[in-house]
UniProtKB/Swiss-Prot annotation:
Compartment(s): Cytoplasm, Cytoskeleton, Microtubule organizing center, Centrosome, Centriole; Cytoplasm, Cytoskeleton, Cilium basal body
PANTHER family xref list: CILIUM ASSEMBLY PROTEIN DZIP1L, ZINC FINGER PROTEIN DZIP1
Species per Swiss-Prot/TrEMBL record: Drosophila melanogaster
Region (Interaction with Rab8): 1-293
Annotated GO MF terms: zinc ion binding
Primary location: cytoplasm
A Pfam family that the UniProt record links to this protein: Dzip-like_N
Biased composition (Basic and acidic residues): 244-266, 415-438, 724-737
Domain of life, per lineage: Eukaryota
Protein's name in the database: Cilium assembly protein DZIP1L
């Protein structure tokens, strides 16, 4: 199109790539809000600018494939989208160029202003300097005026000669006729004075010319049009016996004759002096020419010597054959002296630094020796340290010697049917009053919940079983110490991260105390029961759907999403995804053993869930499947059909009541100081009946409950609730009940 810039090459260098968006819905509401005729009529460029981003990222691929049959029209749409993307990239590039040029323009304007200001200041300084120069020159020119006439003289000697010759009193004629020697002396002094005065005048003229030339050069360089004020030239009057006739009495003839003779002598003297002056000038010219010729010859010799030295350096003779000139020797001597001085100074500084370092190390070593002495004294007199046992957060399946696999399964089934279910299938943990134990230290409780989606299988029912870890028996003759593992670190980190969400949704979990049966199991001798100093907190609030929705909204708001918006844009989704991945990578770096613990927990859960039943239980499960927990009878089913039960269901319900009674009795026995629980012999048969019985009994529902909306089935929850002494939360719930 005739543009000067190569925009395709520039766009390719920036790394821009064309993209075709296929995933995602089209915003038909936004496109419906645009009125093309009105935009054309009003020339609404702002609305078109807003629509550019949506048009460039609209997923046209799937829509064009399904809605437009003509491939040419589809290509027009796709090429228009590519063109929009390309033009948007060019616009961003040009915008950046314009901003850079504006910044450069502003900086250039500022520099021009500063330069103009500095130029005006420099011009003012030049003018002031010219004024000062003129003042100094005027001060340096010392003038000696005559007090008897209007003439001025340069030196005091010239003024005295002028007064002695011009303004002296007339002498008698006998004195005027002096000898020839005196006349010769006067002539010599006059010639000398004239020559000195002329030389001073020439020097002054040359100085004035030099000053004028310097001013012109400065004015041309600065470009200032101001003309420096011209200095007034002062003329010096030369006074001698040869220039003017002496004033004598006109009445005496002798005076006239003497004046005539003097004038003749003055004329002859002046002619001689002029000839001498001309000869002196010619001699000066010749000497100057000879001097200039000598200088030129020397310059030619120097240039010739420089050329020879260059040629000699080009031939690169060995360094040993070269003879150092006096200048080079002086430079080498100066350099060696400087290097020696620098070496001395640096050595002195290094000695000071080393001395300071040695003193610091000596002080640190003395402090370390004192600390080691203190530690050795403390080791000599050790104090008994009370170890506070902390419950391990790693779910490790440990089977007691007295307890078999059947007992563990029995406890799991009992705890399953004794738990209370809420609307959102969460379980609240209540704290029981604490019994007396061997040591009055607080026991920490860990709770690990592994939530998995329910996967239907042939042998499993749709109920939500809760598997608990088998109670763990601590070693009787070993002190319990803190167990810090990678699982505890990772779980503690997760708890600190989700502290705000937990505080808004539910209260902090209370510690579940241990029962006195475990203490009795370790030591059969009765112990004194000490009252616990803990305050019983209110039970935890269950997490409902409303709370979960609030928690999700809060999380989304923290990431910058608006709750009023109906969807999440692709860019914001990418941004949040990148932020979460960065956060996850940071957590991976902080807790490198997190995945190891997760795999360990998974293996433990799979091991628990893959417990095999006996052959009789498997046969019963094959012949009869349990009912669903949320199954509700229809309106057309009569109450007689609902109330009818099979003999096996009645037997199973009776077996459940018996197991409940036995669990209550066993709990009462555990509360008593008896050492062991009573285990029934016919538990195996009763367990098989419990496994075959339905998970929930069918009851008649009211009309309001039947007409209400169906509740979706919750996901399966697997909970590992253990305390330090091996008891589970289910045992503590049984104690409370």
């Amino acid at each position: 199109m005739g543009f000067k810039g190569k925009y395709p090459q520039m766009v390719r260098e920036t790394g821009f790539k064309l993209r075709q968006y296929r995933d995602g819905p089209l915003d038909w509401r936004l496109m419906g809000s645009y009125e093309t005729e009105r935009i054309l009529r009003e020339q609404n460029f702002e609305l078109v600018d807003k629509a550019l981003t949506h048009l460039s990222e609209a997923p046209l691929g799937t829509v064009l494939e399904t809605h437009i049959l003509d491939s040419g029209i589809a290509k027009y749409f796709v090429m228009s989208q590519y063109a929009i993307q390309y033009l948007m990239c060019c616009r961003t590039y040009l915008d950046e160029c314009v901003t850079d040029l504006k910044e450069a323009h502003t900086t250039a304007q500022e520099e021009i202003a500063t330069l103009r200001k500095s130029l005006s200041e420099s011009n003012n300084e030049v003018v002031q300097l010219h004024k000062r120069i003129t003042q100094i020159e005027a001060i340096r020119e010392v003038v000696y005026p005559c007090h008897l006439c209007t003439k001025n003289f340069i030196s005091n000697e010239a003024l005295n000669v002028h007064i002695g010759r011009k303004h002296r009193v007339a002498s008698p004629p006998s004195l005027t006729s002096a000898t020839g020697k005196e006349k010769d002396r006067d002539k010599a002094t006059d010639v000398h004075l004239i020559n000195t005065i002329k030389m001073e005048l020439e020097i002054k003229q040359l100085k004035e010319r030099l000053n004028a030339a310097e001013r012109n050069i400065k004015e041309r360089s600065t470009g200032s049009k101001r003309v420096s004020p011209r200095q007034e030239q002062r003329h010096v009057g030369i006074q001698s016996n040869l220039a003017e006739p002496k004033e004598k009495d006109e009445d005496s003839g002798e005076a006239r004759q003497s004046e005539a003779s003097e004038r003749k002598e003055q004329l002859t003297g002046l002619a001689e002096r002029l000839s001498n002056f001309e000869e002196w000038q010619t001699q000066l010219k010749q000497s100057n020419e000879q001097f200039i010729q000598d200088i030129n010859k020397r310059l030619e010799g120097l240039s010739h010597a420089l050329e020879q030295s260059k040629q000699a350096s080009a031939s690169t003779p060995p360094l040993e054959d070269r003879v150092a000139t006096p200048c080079l020797e002086d430079l080498e001597r100066i350099l060696t002296e400087k290097v020696a001085e620098i070496g001395k100074v640096s050595a002195h500084r290094l000695e000071e630094v080393v001395y300071h370092l040695e003193e610091g190390y000596k002080e640190k070593l003395g402090a370390l020796e004192r600390e080691l002495k203190q530690l050795s004294v403390q080791k000599v007199q050790p104090e008994p340290v009370q170890t506070v046992p902390v419950a391990s957060k790693i779910p490790k399946p440990v089977v007691r010697k007295e307890e078999t696999n059947i007992d563990r399964i029995r406890k799991q089934v009992e705890s399953e049917f004794l738990k209370q279910k809420h609307d959102d299938d969460t379980y609240s943990i209540e704290e029981a009053p604490r019994k007396g134990s061997e040591k009055p230290f607080p026991q920490l409780v860990t709770q690990v919940q592994v939530v998995e989606k329910e996967q239907p299988s042939a042998g499993s029912s749709d109920s939500n079983p809760t598997y608990t870890k088998s109670p763990r028996e601590p070693a009787p003759n070993k002190q319990e110490t803190k167990e810090a593992t990678d699982v505890s670190d990772s779980l503690s980190q997760e708890e600190t991260e989700n502290e705000e969400e937990r505080s808004l949704t539910e209260e902090e979990g209370t510690d579940v105390p241990t029962s006195g049966s475990e203490a009795a199991r370790e030591d059969p001798t009765p112990k004194t029961i000490k009252p616990s100093g803990r305050i019983i907190k209110s039970p935890q609030k269950p997490l409902t759907r409303k709370d979960a929705r609030k928690m999700v909204n809060r999380k989304l708001m923290s990431h910058g999403f608006d709750m009023k918006s109906k969807g999440i844009s692709h860019n914001s989704l990418k941004r949040v995804n990148s932020e979460l991945t960065e956060h996850r990578n940071k957590l991976k770096l902080q807790h490198p053993h997190f995945y190891a613990t997760r795999n360990r927990i998974r293996k433990f859960v799979e091991k628990l869930c893959s417990a095999k039943f006996s052959e009789r239980a498997e046969m019963l499960l094959k012949h009869k499947s349990p009912l669903k927990p949320m199954e509700v009878p229809g309106k057309g089913i009569p109450r007689s059909a609902i109330s009818e039960k099979s003999e096996e269901d009645i037997a199973s319900s009776q077996g459940e009541e018996q197991t409940d009674e036995q669990t209550d009795s066993s709990e009462q026995q555990t509360r008593s100081p008896s050492p062991q629980r009573l285990v029934s012999r016919d538990f195996k048969a009763r367990l098989e009946e419990i496994l075959v019985k339905p998970a929930a009994t069918i009851r008649g529902a009211s009309k309001s409950s039947l007409s209400s909306r169906p509740v979706p089935l919750p996901r399966k929850r697997v909970m590992f609730n253990t305390t330090e002494d091996g008891k589970s939360f289910n045992d503590s719930d049984d104690n409370l009940k």
